[in-house]
Structure formats: C-alpha cells, structure tokens
Amino acid sequence: MIIGPYINALAIIGGAVIGAALGGRIPERLRTNLTLIFGLCSMGMGIVMVAKTTNMPAMILSVLLGTIIGELLLLEQGINKLASSAKGLVEKMFPDKPSSMNSQEEFLSKFVAIVVLFSFSGTGIFGAMNEGMSGNFDILIVKSFLDFFTAMIFATSLGISVASIFVPQTLVQVILAYSAVFIIPFVTPEMRGDFAAVGGMLMIAAGFRICNIQMFHVANMLPALFLAMPISHFWSTFS
C-alpha cells in the first residue's frame, strides 16, 4: 500500500496552514533569510544529484532538448495561468490575510519555482519510486519533515495558496510509485543516475530563481525529465 505521498501532502497542507496563520508574526528578516537558505539548499541538493550522472553528454542533451521543447510549448505560461487560477480558488475557499508579495508577478514567479521544488525534487522522485519498488517510505517521511517547514515559511508570504501545491506533488509521486513496478525492470543504474542528474539541474535552476539571482524558466525545463532516461539508454548503447 502506497502511503508516503499522502503523508507528504499532509505535511505541506499543515505547514501552509500554520504559516498562513502566523503571517506577519514571523519577522521579515527571518522569512527573507530562510527563503534564501531554501534556495541555497535546493542548489546544494541539485549539485549532489548532478554528481550522480554517468553520461554527461546525455544529461546535457536532455536539458537542452527538454528546454527547447518547453519553450516552444510555453509550459511556464500555462503553469502561470494554472497557478493564478489555483490562488484565486484556494483563497476563496480559505480567506487569507493580505500577502506580503509586492505583485501578482512576484507571486507567480515564486509559486512556479516552489511547485518545481516540491513536486520534481530528486528526493521526492526517488522516494516515490523507492516506495513503489520496496514498500519503504522512509525517504518520503524525511522529505515530509523538510516540506512542512518549507511550506510554513513560504506561506507566510504567499498565503494559504501554498497548500494547493500538494495536488501536483501528490499526483507526480503517486504516478511514479505505482508505475515503478513496471518501469524499474527496464531501468539501468546508468539511466537512473542520468535521470537524477537532470533533476539536479532543475533544482539548481529553481534555487537560483528562489534566491532571485537568475530567473530561469524552470517549468520550461521539465520535459528534460522525460527525455533523460531514453537519451541515457541511447547514449550508453551506441557510444
């Protein structure tokens, strides 16, 4: 029975509710500094994930082709619209105090970045696949601890809308967990390493975005995740 993704979802909802309730009670300097730390942690974890690559050319090609596809499909623009709709829907259901965000554009920018950080992190992906294969959900429990505090801090500025992130995250994790049984027999260690490395690249980009260092179109890079394993397999076979 798969339970890890649902525990992770409850952690996000709980953290978001507490953070939205606390709001301005948390000092601005603490919210700002912790947001920077979350971005730094994202980049740090991303670097560790990138180090797992087996075929660097396959990793780079996946990121390049995936980003081109995402840019042509305007994925981030679509996610922005969904994020805006979700924000309005959630705030109607759970009235929130005025957000400290300076603009809707700033809200969307951070919202998209944390959707990627929560839903497509290497920890979540590996944890979901690991539970599907072995039934061990310890990795997702650890991720739930981290996500609880991350959601709480982000909700102090983004509001209760952060709770809605549990929807894409749970969807991704449940699909991965239930499909792992069918996928893993065909996945080599090399493919797994290159897949983790591509996810790490996205986490680094998300970290830069959260820290407002460089506004990568992270959502437009998502197709790279789906290209990573096929390209890795092709490269290992014919190189």
Question: What name fits each language-model region?
Answer:
Residues I18-R31, V48-T54, I153-L202, R209-H217:
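Transmembrane-helix boundary and interhelical-loop signature of multi-pass inner-membrane proteins
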Residues M49-P57, L73-A83:
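Transmembrane alpha-helix boundary signature
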Residues P98-S164:
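Internal active-site segments that recognize and position negatively charged phosphoryl groups
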Residues M1-G14, L61, A128, G132-F145, ...:
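Structural signature of hydrophobic alpha-helical transmembrane segments
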Residues I7-G19, G23, G39-L40, G44, ...:
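Alpha-helical transmembrane segments in multi-pass membrane proteins
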Residues A197-S239:
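Long hydrophobic alpha-helical segments typical of transmembrane helices together
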Residues M1-A9, R29, K52, M56, ...:
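Hydrophobic, aromatic-rich alpha-helical transmembrane segments
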